[in-house]
Amino acid sequence: MTTLSPEAFAGHTPMMQQYLRIKADHPDTLVFYRMGDFYELFFEDAEKAARLLDLTLTQRGASAGTPIKMAGVPHHAVEQYLAKLVKMGESVAICEQIGDPATSKGPVERKVVRVVTPGTLTDAALLSDKNDVYLLAMCTGHNKRGVAVNIGLAWLNLASGALRLAEIESEQLAAALERIRPAEILTPDGATDAIPAGAGASKRVPAWHFDIASGTQRLCDQLDVASLDGFGAHSLTSACGAAGALLLYAAATQGQQLRHVRSLKVENETEYIGLDPATRRNLELTETLRGTESPTLYSLLDTCCTTMGSRLLRHWLHHPPRASVAAQSRQQAIGALLDAPANASLDALRSALRQIADVERITGRLALLSARPRDLSSLRDTFAALPALRERISAIVANADALARVDAALAPPAECLDLLTSAIATEPAAMVRDGGVIARGYDAELDELRDISENCGQFLIDLEARERARTGIANLRVEYNKVHGFYIEVTRGQTDKVPDDYRRRQTLKNAERYITPELKTFEDKALSAQERALARERALYDSVLQALLPFIPECQRVASALAELDLLAAFAERARALDWVAPTFTDEIGIEIEQGRHPVVEAQVEQFIANDCRFGPERKLLLITGPNMGGKSTFMRQTALIALMAYVGSYVPAKSACFGPIDRIFTRIGAADDLAGGRSTFMVEMTEAAAILNDATPQSLVLMDEIGRGTSTFDGLALAWAIARHLLAHNACYTLFATHYFELTQLPAEFPQAANVHLSAVEHGHGIVFLHAVNEGPANQSYGLQVAQLAGVPAPVIRAARKHLAYLEQQSASQHTPQLDLFSAPPAAIDDLECADAPALPDTPHPALEKLRDIDPDDLKPREALDLLYELRTLVRSHDADGHA
């Protein structure tokens, strides 16, 4: 605890001195200071909380001559206020009364029992059911010369106890943070590492917390091992430094040991298919480009029956394994679930899973001794349901190794279940302070105290009947009031019948009130029975929590198995409902998708046109041409999504699909200005293209959509041509290259590994019908004017564009110049077309021609067309009569 100078306390009351000491230890944290039924905030904390939470700011007296500004929240509603503050990135120290007000001399003893921060949430009320919350620490590693060589990362899901380490290059930091999405990031004081905007709440901690030797020892102590060799982490020095700071910070916020952090996973970048931030964003895995949660691949796949399964799905989507072995194991399990006999049907299994509690997070709270009564009853009911759940999958475990592993892990911890069954009431109260949590029969003393409290009325009735019979006083009454407690009342005319063991308690005008040894004994028990029962129940509950701690590893094992079973069952349900198939894998280079469909778009439309996609050693780049809105981007995205789904372990939306090795997926689809970073749309596009050209390998899948926009026509065309050539000649990756530069369709003549495909459309009048079918060969036109018309561009603009298009096509044909890209640069204004190369226009145009130019046949009714025809004939005759040719 920080010690303040005596001068700092001069003039302050004892209570404010206590507060100031506590606040000095948490200078950058809001302190919720418990006073009775409220948590109070003082001084600057009060002003800040009032502003953030819209609380009333009050002022009560002064301390050391300074007005005491106050704001408070009721203790029973504290969680809703904590949730708001954490969402804003704030941290809150919860300071509770731990002393007894009745026996305290001076202020009641208080201390901070926990600190709630964005990255250390465990309370159910503060957590999103389907999102994990990560605390991450980063530590820069240096060589002997002091040169930075890497960045060590350690991140912890405190709610589950999952701890992971990795070491990355500095340029990989943005991608790593996008994948992990930490809620809070710890960095050393004085560090210069640039954390990308929006990556998470940043927290500076003392640099010595990141000491590598101390961190390594702290990690070994946490995992109860002598060395980290068994986890493959012995050489990750900077990551161990980060882990040391992370564990120190997390334990400090909880005010206790992290008993559930018992394992460690080291992540290697070669373990998963690489997905950079642009790819995760463009494929809309868990969030749309508009920032909404639906429609996304995650929202389509998430039919999980438990929140554990939903969280695991999110993790799998962002961590598709490169090795196809994991995917094949999962798909084998899906097949077994789909082929299960009636007694182990998929529907029956999912119905049973809906009754399962969130064992993962309950276990986390149990380890931190913060589990509530209904957490324990839910854990008990889940463990009791495990035998029936295992019975449902027992018939099919032989057909799938993944299911056999899950089945073995679902063996219920018998001793844990016995303790929960005997100790916890069938339907306990929400909070221990409300009573009714410990089951009857678990503790004789508690049962007796409850009996006294619950049977008080009956005891008094029985006592009154016995005393009337014993004394012969017919109007004797046994009663109670708050001032005098229990008493026996006898009217004055009957006092001569009072036995010797009656002791006078109160004299009234017409009666005497007595107490007997038996009634006094009962009174002592009854008056304190409820209070003593609650205290006894609290002590018993705490002892139950302590007794459950040894079962944490078993609870974690069950939670992991339940999440995997639930997710596999959800994959099976999606495959059955949406007519998906199991993909196959090969070690050969290639991708073969027959009648593939975009999983998310298909769910949003009535009819979806399926398309094939084929890559191989002799076919590495597809040049995709066709109209805007024709489906080029959809076709590219669906190819990437089908590949990702296959490696995640799901069935895929296709008639058949086969995949060779894939190490990374890149996308260059669409872009927007990066205003905060000072980058234009074109700069963003080129940055993404550079990453692809530098990092793509022959096993990478690359999506390039209309590269070269945002600059001059010839600059853009030159860049697109050079980029496509480089991808073919040097990267040799699987590439889907959509373009409006029709000059690029000549590329297959130079590179046989390139092929032209196009999205077809049919012109109808001045309109267009998109067929969304992918065909071999290049498109014959872009249909840009028709798309513009569909978009609602005014008719005069469309007519002017048609005139200019005809002129440009005529000019191109006469001069043999390349076709211009109509979508990269706007055409010159019609009024500016009089240039040296333009044909001379007649000084006096024919009036009939002028009239014809202004006509839109699609807008004419039959009668109007006939009248116009007569008008044109009149104009021609009149013009000829004036002597014109």
Swiss-Prot record:
GO terms for cellular component: cytosol. Gene3D superfamilies: 1.10.1420.10, 6.10.140.430, DNA repair protein MutS, domain I, MutS, connector domain, P-loop containing nucleotide triphosphate hydrolases. Transmembrane segments: none annotated. Coiled coil: none annotated. ATP binds at G626, P627, N628, M629, G630, G631, K632, S633. Keywords: ATP-binding, DNA damage, DNA repair, DNA-binding, Nucleotide-binding. The keyword ATP-binding applies. CDD domains: ABC_MutS1. GO terms for molecular function: ATP binding; ATP-dependent DNA damage sensor activity; damaged DNA binding; mismatched DNA binding. It holds the Pfam family MutS_IV. PROSITE patterns: DNA_MISMATCH_REPAIR_2 (PS00486). It comes from the Bacteria. One of its GO terms (biological process) is mismatch repair. InterPro entries: DNA_mismatch_repair_MutS, DNA_mismatch_repair_MutS-lik_N, DNA_mismatch_repair_MutS/MSH, DNA_mismatch_repair_MutS_C, DNA_mismatch_repair_MutS_clamp, DNA_mismatch_repair_MutS_core, DNA_mismatch_repair_MutS_N, DNA_mismatch_repair_MutS_sf. This protein is involved in the repair of mismatches in DNA. It is possible that it carries out the mismatch recognition step. This protein has a weak ATPase activity. Belongs to the DNA mismatch repair MutS family. This is DNA mismatch repair protein MutS. It comes from Burkholderia cenocepacia (strain ATCC BAA-245 / DSM 16553 / LMG 16656 / NCTC 13227 / J2315 / CF5610) (Burkholderia cepacia (strain J2315)). The gene is mutS.
